[in-house]
Swiss-Prot record:
Monomer. It holds the Pfam family GTP_EFTU. InterPro entries: EF-Tu_GTP-bd, EF-Tu_GTPase, EFTu-like_2, EFTU_2, P-loop_NTPase, Small_GTP-bd, T_Tr_GTP-bd_dom, Transl_B-barrel_sf. This is Elongation factor Tu. Residues 10-219 form the tr-type G domain. GO terms for cellular component: cytoplasm. Belongs to the TRAFAC class translation factor GTPase superfamily. Classic translation factor GTPase family. EF-Tu/EF-1A subfamily. Its main location: cytoplasm. The gene is tuf. PANTHER family: ELONGATION FACTOR TU, MITOCHONDRIAL, ELONGATION FACTOR TU-RELATED. Signal peptide: none annotated. One of its GO terms (molecular function) is GTPase activity. It comes from Brachyspira hyodysenteriae.
């Protein structure tokens, strides 16, 4: 299964592409891997457009009965200073909620905007969602600049993007905006050009430099107890079951005992292998890894559970929380709600319906309010105090919360 060992000599950073459908997110993802693999052939593999697209499409066709279907593709690449894990998020409006999990894993995002089309509906939605889920750093790639008849159009679109970033709480004037053509960069690499000197590859080098300099080195909680939210589950013939996800804290290595917590009764097992991009690793906080589990059947584990050091986290259905309900201008509800309200609660990699009950003398919670609430989920999930979550309804985020007290252990 593994093809080598990841040495981890460079700082590891998680990024991803966001933006409107057909603006070139997947093409840019492929272009970055093409340029990076030409510069670092020993450690980076070029990922063709079709491979990135098919990964998203195949995941998008997963079981429709599941609570949350994620259509994303994971690739890796390097700059001179960093190792990047990159998630390519879908841009269709129907998949907008899928970005929550992808975006929640990002230390920064690459916003792709077509210079031909300018800012479009999903451009704004993805920027808003990035702000809501805590992605604090965005780098902009103005794509398809080779197709512009009038160079001034790029100036107009750039100003439009800055306005959108400012509107949603980012500093548009300080945000790096790189102009270029992802497809031209791919064609240059395919023609055997040197990426460090070819003019069509310069935009990708500039983008990598912007990622290196604008997104700060992430602070990882390596010294805490291991916890990884399960994003996907695979069965490998002759080997067993593999669960994948981003390590939230701590570290894991071959031979460690772990528990699978949430949704189902807690199970204890042993991790018999840890890999990242087909390389054996000691998994540490921030890494997207696959963990091979001993004696666990594929059907016995699912997305939304967590893998954790035994005894460090428990499943809960009922809890108290401090929440902020977004105002209409922030993309939230237009009206208030009362006890009995049943939105979706997004915790880590899953969403669960929860029944909200107001506390004290409160009769109604209005947009813009901070409130203490009691929430009961229909399914127990791994939960701990100070854990953050999003409240979603009708395809949009209507509130953000933090767990203040777990009431009942399942």
């Amino acid at each position: 299964m593994a093809k080598g060992t990841y040495e981890g000599n460079k700082t590891h950073v998680n990024v991803g592409t966001i933006g409107h459908v057909d603006h070139g997110k997947t093409t840019l993802t492929s272009a970055i891997t093409a340029v990076s693999s030409a510069m670092f052939p020993a450690t980076v593999q070029k990922v063709a457009y079709d491979s990135v697209a098919k990964a998203s499409e195949s995941q998008g066709r997963r079981d429709p009965t599941k609570i949350l279907t994620i259509a994303t593709s994971h690739v890796e690449y390097e700059s001179d200073n960093r190792h990047y894990a990159h998630v390519d998020c879908p841009g269709h409006a129907d998949y907008i909620k899928n970005m929550i999990t992808g975006a929640a894993q990002m230390d920064g995002a690459i916003l792709v905007v077509s210079a031909e089309d300018g800012v479009m509906p999903q451009t704004k939605e993805h920027v808003l969602l990035s702000r809501q889920v805590g992605v604090n750093y965005i780098v902009v790639f103005l794509n398809k600049c080779d197709k512009l008849d009038d160079p001034e159009m790029a100036e107009i679109v750039e100003a439009e993007v800055i306005d959108v970033l400012d509107h949603y709480g980012f500093d548009g004037s300080k945000t790096p905006i790189i102009r270029g053509s992802a497809i031209k960069a791919i064609q240059a690499i395919e023609a055997g050009k040197d990426p460090r000197t070819d003019p069509d590859c310069k935009c990708i080098l500039d983008l990598l430099n912007a990622l290196d300099t604008y997104i700060p080195d992430p602070v990882r909680e390596v010294d805490k107890d291991f916890l990884m939210s399960i994003e996907d589950v695979y069965s490998i013939p002759g080997r067993g079951t593999v669960v994948t996800g981003r390590i939230e804290r701590g570290k894991i290595e071959k031979g460690n005992e772990v528990e699978i917590v949430g949704i189902r009764p807690t199970q204890k097992t042993t991790c018999t292998g840890v890999e990242m991009f087909k390389k054996e690793v000691v998994g540490i906080a921030g890494y997207n890894v696959g963990c091979l589990l001993r004696g666990i059947e594929r059907k016995a584990v699912e997305r939304g559970q967590v893998l954790a050091k035994p005894g460090t986290i428990t499943p809960h259905k009922k809890f108290e929380a401090e929440v902020y309900i977004l105002k209409k201008e922030e993309g939230g509800r237009h009206s208030g709600f009362v006890s009995g309200y049943r939105p979706q609660m997004y915790f880590r990699t899953t969403d669960v319906t929860g029944v909200i009950n107001l506390q004290g003398d409160a009769q109604m919670i209005m947009p813009g309010d901070n409130a203490n609430l009691t929430i009961e989920l229909i399914t127990p999930i791994a939960m701990e105090e100070k854990q953050r979550f999003a409240i979603r309804e009708g395809g949009k985020t209507v509130g953000n919360g933090v767990v203040t007290k777990n009431i009942r252990i399942i």
